[in-house]
From Swiss-Prot:
This is Putative F-box only protein 15. Residues 5-52 form the F-box domain. InterPro entries: F-box-assoc_dom_typ1 (IPR006527), F-box-assoc_interact_dom (IPR017451), F-box-like_dom_sf (IPR036047), F-box_dom (IPR001810), Gal_Oxase/kelch_b-propeller (IPR011043), SCF_F-box_component (IPR050796). Transmembrane segments: none annotated. It comes from Arabidopsis thaliana (Mouse-ear cress). It comes from the Eukaryota. Gene3D superfamilies: 1.20.1280.50.
Length: 378
């Protein structure tokens, strides 16, 4: 290490910064103690955001409330670590939303009752920091949450919460600002969000599929603190999955299923894509189809995990998901990384396998995630 320090001290500052910019966030977190120069670079806000904007996407997977797995989808290599103790019962995961390497964790108390407990947290898996968010009054199990930031100041992170269709109360919409550590109530109409589709945070704003007479993309602008109907969705049918493409576009993955006996059978995949979300008029166009037998189910089904996937630049899909196989009268859950293009499955790597006790419905979910050193806002 002493030799390494002497070498890097002799390098120009700009070159050291460029080398560190290409280093994974997990390694940078350890390198902060190497020397004062590195610490100064790594902890500067300008560097942290520059590093974040040039970092590749990963999959993050929570396995039955016990293990956090983070995978590089290009290599299939993944690391795992225990789920933080504070996210074990009674504060177990229900869902998450990603923004700038920060995970907004919506936790469950396994009831549909109002709760005044802090069941909402922001977590950075790299730095291991966690902040619990106390409710203004109470949270409800069917509330919708999103995380983003004011585009005039990226460090000004905010959380939006609005009531779902089972709240039985007047429509509630609240916004939490980390800078003031407080909630405010917003005056807004009721929104019926499509519950089968997760919301995504893109460029500081939240996007959901919402439903009135037809399904459309609903945006919450954290700068203006307003909702907006962005564009109409293509016919979704039973399922639809939103994601992020090239940092400023929304892909929509559609895949319906047939039932073969008691099992769900995957059918063809259609991927639609918006133009840039900053354009004056936003709309979906068909990006590509996948017509092939034996495709994996890229949606939540039965007691399997919610799969993680993202759309590549070459009309391809990378997906990390589960399937069941039967061997010697025993059922096993296989976790598999798929590379899929328009011709079908190009490559698949089994990354794990364990005994499956059917219908016990374990909690397992996957998300697209970018590791970062962005500090959890205080």
């Amino acid at each position: 290490m002493a030799f390494s320090k002497r070498v890097y001290r002799s390098l120009p500052f700009e070159l050291v910064e460029e080398i560190l910019k290409k280093t994974p966030a997990e390694s940078l977190n350890r390198f902060k103690s190497t020397c004062k120069q590195w610490y100064g670079i790594i902890t500067s806000k300008r560097f942290m955001y520059n590093h974040l904007d040039h970092s590749p996407e990963r999959f993050i997977r929570i396995d039955d409330h016990k293990t956090v797995q983070i995978m590089d989808p290009m290599t299939g290599i993944f690391s795992d670590s225990p789920v933080p103790d504070v996210f074990r019962s009674p504060h177990s995961f229900a869902s998450m939303v990603h923004c700038d390497g920060l995970m907004l964790c919506i936790c469950s108390d396994s009831s549909y009752e109002r709760t005044r407990e802090a069941n909402l947290a922001v977590w950075n898996p790299v730095t291991k920091k966690i902040k619990w968010i106390e409710p203004l009054d109470s949270y409800y199990e069917t509330d919708y949450f999103g995380i983003g930031y004011d585009n005039t100041c990226r460090e000004n992170y905010k959380i939006v919460r609005f009531s779902g269709p089972m709240s039985f109360d007047d429509t509630e919409c609240e916004i939490y600002e980390f800078k003031s550590d407080s909630w405010r109530t917003l005056d807004t109409k009721y929104w019926d969000v499509y519950t089968q589709c997760r919301g995504v945070s893109v460029k500081g704003n939240m996007y959901w599929i919402a439903d009135t007479k037809e399904k459309f993309i609903l945006r919450f602008d954290f700068s203006m603190e307003t909702f907006k109907n962005v564009c109409v969705c293509p016919p979704i049918g039973c399922t639809g999955r939103l994601g992020c493409f090239s940092g400023d576009r929304l892909p929509l993955l559609l895949q319906d299923t047939d039932f073969g006996g008691e099992e769900e059978v995957s059918t063809d995949i259609a991927v639609w894509l918006t133009n840039k979300l900053s354009d004056e008029v936003v709309s979906f166009t068909k990006y590509f189809n996948v017509t092939s037998p034996h495709l994996p189910l890229l949606q939540c089904h039965g007691d399997m995990a919610r799969p993680g996937y993202f759309i590549g630049d070459h009309k391809n899909i990378l997906a990390w998901c589960e399937g069941e196989v039967e061997e010697d009268d025993k059922w096993y859950t296989c976790i598999t990384l798929y590379q899929i293009d328009q011709c079908g499955i190009r490559k698949q790597i089994e990354t794990g396998r364990h005994r499956s006790f059917r219908y016990l419905d374990p909690f397992i979910c996957s998300y697209v995630y970018v590791p970062s050193l962005i500090p959890v806002p205080e």
